[in-house]
Amino acid sequence: MTNLFDLSGKTALVTGASKGIGAMIATGLLQSGVKTYISSRKEDELFGTQEKLSQYGECVAICADLSTYEGVVGLASKIKDSEPKLSILINNAGATWGAALEDFPETGWDKVMNLNVKSLFYLTTELLPSIRLAATSDDPARVVNVGSINGLS
């Protein structure tokens, strides 16, 4: 019987993958045969996670700060330089604020919106040619946007 979750031959990018939900998603993809790129702005955590996940398959770490447009474009460029096709994009990077609602500064709001909204839009549009190239009529490529309240705890 073939493995229902076999995704061999596919390539994925998981952002915010140094820990938590992102690391768990990357683990599942690797165990299903996917070459998986992981990214995070926290370099030490990212490469530690890469080392752990490499036991499951080909895991490549790229350090990137997606809170800026330049960081998004830089990550997309590195992916496009390495992979002509991207079958799966998991937009998981995110942040929350560290202030009470009534004291919340505009700079904090901008940071949250840049990472949680703008970065996933621009990363998707930057990688769209690679995503379209991976898609077929029988097997479309996937973009998954993740939201969580993990940062609130």
Please provide the spans of the model-predicted regions:
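Conserved glycine-rich cofactor-binding loop
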Residues: 11, 18-20
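Conserved glycine-rich Rossmann-like NAD(P)H-binding loop of the short-chain dehydrogenase/reductase
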Residues: 32-48
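The beta1-alpha1 cofactor-binding region of Rossmann-like NAD(H)/NADP(H)-dependent oxidoreductases
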Residues: 44, 63-74, 106
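Conserved NAD(P)H cofactor-binding loop of Rossmann-fold oxidoreductase domains
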Residues: 92-97
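Substrate-binding pocket helix/loop in short-chain dehydrogenase/reductase
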Residues: 100-101, 105-110
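A short, exposed helix-loop element centered on a Lys and neighboring polar residues
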Residues: 124-125
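Residue(s) in the substrate-gating loop at a strand-loop-helix junction
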Residues: 148
